[in-house]
Amino acid sequence: MNILFCNYEYPPLGGGGGVINALLAEELATRHEVTVLTSQGLGLPAESVVNGVRVVRAPVFFRSQQAAANVPSMLAFLPMGIAAGKRLIKANRYDVINTHFVLPTGPVGAALARFGKLPHVLSVHGGDLYDPSKWISPHRHFVLRTWIKRLLRQADSLVGQSRNTIDNVHTYYDASLDVARIPLGIKRPAVDAARRADYGFTDDQVLLVTVGRLVARKAMDQLISVLKDTDRPDAHLVIIGSGPQEQALQQQSRELGVADRVHFMGQTDERDKFRLLQVSDIFVSTSQHEGFGLVYLEAMASGLPVVCYDYGGQTDFLTDGVTGHVVPLNDTALFTECCRKLISDREASQKISDRNLELVEDLYIENCARQYEQLFEDLIKKQQVQ
């Protein structure tokens, strides 16, 4: 197959949605021709080949951060992405288009599918449908809801990565739509012996670690409060990621008197991210919603128990008392108590760690890619018959 992916964000830009697209594209590129159409910014080249994937970047304007997008740059991607995509379709014979995120990428993928008369698979990731932390979340606005309904209905096939994402499609947009559930996956992490001393930590510290963009939806201010409330001076919080809330979080840690125990590691590469996970003790997340939550899989693959909230796609594979603790949304008192238990009971924590290493075996990228591959092939055959 010759596959064209469309995604507004693709590494190094953006967050988890771009990461999963890259993992999927790279896995499929081992046996197919794969091109990704994405946005250009921050000095990135207009075109490159990354791990066997041809990446074509349409120029956009006003993007100033690697981790977070803005409305002007998203709007600019619509005409620029369509123009770049049409040039690609004229020069190449693609078999299928897979668009990731109904907004802002959906209009680009839909236009290119019509232009090239190609089957169109639209993958929705959660935040493009529903984000409780944002006033501009599409589910709150009639015009955006109407636009999304149209894009969802136009696609030849829809994919959601979790029951929660599919529920949001049906609740806020169109209950009649058929949405395939294909769980996401991660790349199996390399065995890379890491030492705490490499990152300035000691063996007598208890490391709570989190990964994510420092934005409102991640609610990392709660984690800093949780750290203080554990009443464990040996507990430290390791934050991997960057974003617009970093200064406010640093100020909060100073005000609460825990600045010496909150460690902002910034945006790391994959190797350092997994090394930091491997030297930590517990993965924690107070994210208000995740369409799926790749970071939870990364934590499990690193042998960490997970403490998180019960709202989002992670509830498809995380179970309270089995993979760690799944806490009612925003119950910070219970969240803190669960962290205390795992810190205090190292034997129970180790059992959870061992179990998570077993459970994550079904959630690596090769399984996700096989399901997408089958969907693409079925859709192509269906179009050929018609």
Language-model features and meaning:
Residues L118-V121, L129-R150:
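Nucleotide-sugar donor phosphate/pyrophosphate-binding loop at the beta->alpha transition
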Residues M1-R54, Q384:
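N-terminal subdomain of nucleotide-sugar transferases
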Residues Q288:
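Aromatic "clamp/platform" in nucleotide-sugar-dependent glycosyltransferases that forms part
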Residues L334, K341, A348-D362, Q371-Q374:
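A short, well-ordered alpha-helix in the C-terminal region of glycosyltransferases
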Residues D320-G321, H325-T332, K341-R346:
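Conserved acidic donor-binding segment of nucleotide-sugar-dependent glycosyltransferases
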Residues I166-I186:
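Helix-loop-beta element that forms the nucleotide-linked donor phosphate-binding surface
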Residues P305-C308, L318:
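Short hydrophobic beta-strand element within catalytic cores of glycosyltransferases
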Residues L4, F201-K218, I224-L227:
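Conserved donor-binding/catalytic core segment of Leloir-type glycosyltransferases
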